[in-house]
Amino acid sequence: MSIPRIFAKASESEVKCAFSGGKAKHRLLVVSDEGLRVLDVGDEVGELVGDVYIQRVYDDAYRWLVDFEAGVVLKSAVVLPLSGPPIFLHEGERVYLIEALGRIVVPLVRVGEVVSPGRRLAAIFTGKRELRYLRSDVSGRIAYVGQIDVKPQRYIFILIPRLE
């Protein structure tokens, strides 16, 4: 099973530490006017023009990506879904946070999908063996789907609001 990749915007000190002898020590994403360029570990870097992002562990991204209280992005990031265009999350941007909690939670959407109000996001099996569906009450694009807890299962869905 493949999962999307997430890259966090690197500070100047992180950029300096990301190279050794002109080669990348981490997987990097360079965003410039010419487009996106992914550099794997050991690739020759050359001259970097644009913003540099460092790949992070996707499953742990909810810890540093968003503020659950305010619903805003804490650190700029780029998510590369399995298919479709990249998703840019900018620091300070407001996002929708939707939580699914139950004995067994099965996500029904993938990162990059566009959802509208009423769309099923997850199937939830309760402790009483009932099947319930979590539906979206907003329209937007799925930017992140991640599991937070194992028992009971807890998933977080991050949606970027759709601009009308």
Regions found by a protein language model. Give the residues of each.
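Well-ordered secondary-structure scaffolds
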Residues: 1-164
